[in-house]
Swiss-Prot record:
One of its GO terms (molecular function) is transferase activity. InterPro entries: LicD/FKTN/FKRP_NTP_transf (IPR007074), LPS_cholinephosphotransferase (IPR052942), RPE1 (IPR005728). It is a single-pass membrane protein. It comes from Rickettsia typhi (strain ATCC VR-144 / Wilmington). It comes from the Bacteria. This is Uncharacterized protein RT0683. One of its GO terms (biological process) is glycoprotein metabolic process.
Length: 309
C-alpha cells in the first residue's frame, strides 16, 4: 500500500507542475516510492527473519536451554519427594551399586580381626543392623553396604576399653562419641547395649527405636557364615530384622546413611525397593585372601616379651 505521505507528495507535485509532464514525472516518482518502499519492507522482513533465527540458535541461548532442562531434571530427581516404587535390576545394573573389591576385602579383614580380638579376650559380641541383615540374607556383606555394625553389652565396656590398644597395634584408628568406631580403610561401629525392662537397647535407641532385641531373640548367641569367616550373632534375628527392615526378604533398599560410594543417589533411587534377584543376593566379594593379623601380632608380642626377659 502506498504511504499517505507518498500520495500527498504525488498530488502536490501535480498541482505545481505543468500538465501531463508534471503528472508523468509525479507518477514515475510515485511508482519509484512504491517499489522502493515495498522492496525495503521485504528486505527488512527477510533480514528480521534471519536475525531472529540467529538469535534463537545462538550459543548463549542453546546453553541457557540446556541449563534449564538440566535444572528441571535435578529438581525432579533430587529435590522432589517420591512415592515408593518397585524395580527389578538387570545383572549389569546391580554392578553399578556394588562396593569395590578393595572395600569388600577391607571390610572382611576388619570383621575377621574384630571377631578374633574380642573372642580372644572373652568379650561377647553379636553382629547387628545391616551386618546382621547381610549375614542372614547374603551370607556376607550386603553388596552395597560399606560399613560394619556389632553390639556388646554395657557390662563388657570397661574390658573392651582395655583392649583398644590391641586394635591400634593392628593399625586401626579408634573414635568414640556415644558409639565406638574402629576404622582402617573402612569402619566398624560398636553399639553398647543395656537392658531396659524386657528389651536390650543401645544408646541411640531414640534415633533407631526399632533396633532392639528381646532376650529370647538375642541369647544364646550363635555363629553365622560371613563370607569365608564365621561371626557371632543373635539366636533369632527375624524379629529384629522385621522391625528394622520390613519386607527385607523380598526387597532391597540401596540407600543408607553410610553408603559413601553412592553419594549422588537420587530421591527416586532412595525411594526404590529393588526386587531381590540371584545377582542382588550375592554378597560383596572377594572374600579373601585375608591376613592373619591378630596371630601375627600376638606372636610378635610373645617374642618381644621373651627377648625382654
Amino acid at each position: 500500500m502506498i504511504k499517505l505521505k507518498s500520495i500527498l507528495n504525488f498530488l502536490y507535485n501535480i498541482a505545481n507542475k505543468d500538465g501531463f509532464k508534471g503528472y508523468k514525472e509525479c507518477r514515475t516518482s510515485a511508482y519509484k516510492n512504491v517499489f522502493d518502499d515495498s522492496s525495503t519492507k521485504s528486505t527488512s522482513k527477510f533480514h528480521l527473519g534471519i536475525s531472529d533465527t540467529k538469535n534463537l540458535l545462538s550459543l548463549q541461548n542453546i546453553i541457557g536451554l540446556i541449563l534449564i532442562i538440566f535444572a528441571g531434571v535435578l529438581f525432579y530427581a533430587y529435590i522432589l519427594q517420591h512415592e515408593w516404587r518397585y524395580v527389578t535390576l538387570s545383572d549389569a545394573q546391580v554392578k553399578r551399586y556394588r562396593i569395590s573389591e578393595k572395600k569388600a576385602l577391607s571390610l572382611y579383614q576388619l570383621m575377621k580381626d574384630t571377631h578374633e580380638l574380642l573372642t580372644k579376650n572373652n568379650i561377647k559380641y553379636w553382629i547387628e543392623s545391616g551386618t546382621l541383615l547381610g549375614a542372614v540374607r547374603h551370607q556376607g556383606i550386603i553388596p552395597f553396604d560399606d560399613d560394619l555394625d556389632i553390639g556388646i553389652m554395657h557390662e563388657d565396656e570397661i574390658h573392651f576399653q582395655q583392649i583398644l590398644p590391641q586394635f591400634k597395634q593392628l593399625g586401626y584408628r579408634i573414635k568414640h562419641n556415644k558409639i565406638y568406631v574402629i576404622c582402617g580403610e573402612r569402619c566398624l561401629d560398636i553399639f553398647i547395649f543395656h537392658k531396659e525392662k524386657d528389651k536390650f537397647v543401645h544408646i541411640l535407641y531414640d534415633q533407631y527405636p526399632n533396633d532392639f532385641f528381646y532376650e529370647n531373640e538375642l541369647y544364646p548367641l550363635k555363629k553365622y557364615k560371613f563370607g569365608n569367616i564365621e561371626v557371632y550373632g543373635p539366636f533369632d534375628p527375624i524379629g529384629n530384622l522385621n522391625r528394622q527392615y520390613p519386607e527385607w526378604d523380598k526387597y532391597a533398599i540401596i540407600y543408607s546413611p553410610h553408603s559413601f560410594h553412592l553419594l549422588f543417589l537420587s530421591n527416586i533411587e532412595k525411594k526404590t525397593k529393588f526386587i531381590l534377584t540371584p545377582e542382588l543376593l550375592k554378597p560383596a566379594q572377594p572374600f579373601g585372601p585375608l591376613k592373619d593379623k591378630v596371630n601375627i601380632v600376638n606372636s610378635a608380642n610373645i617374642y618381644n616379651d621373651m627377648d625382654y626377659h
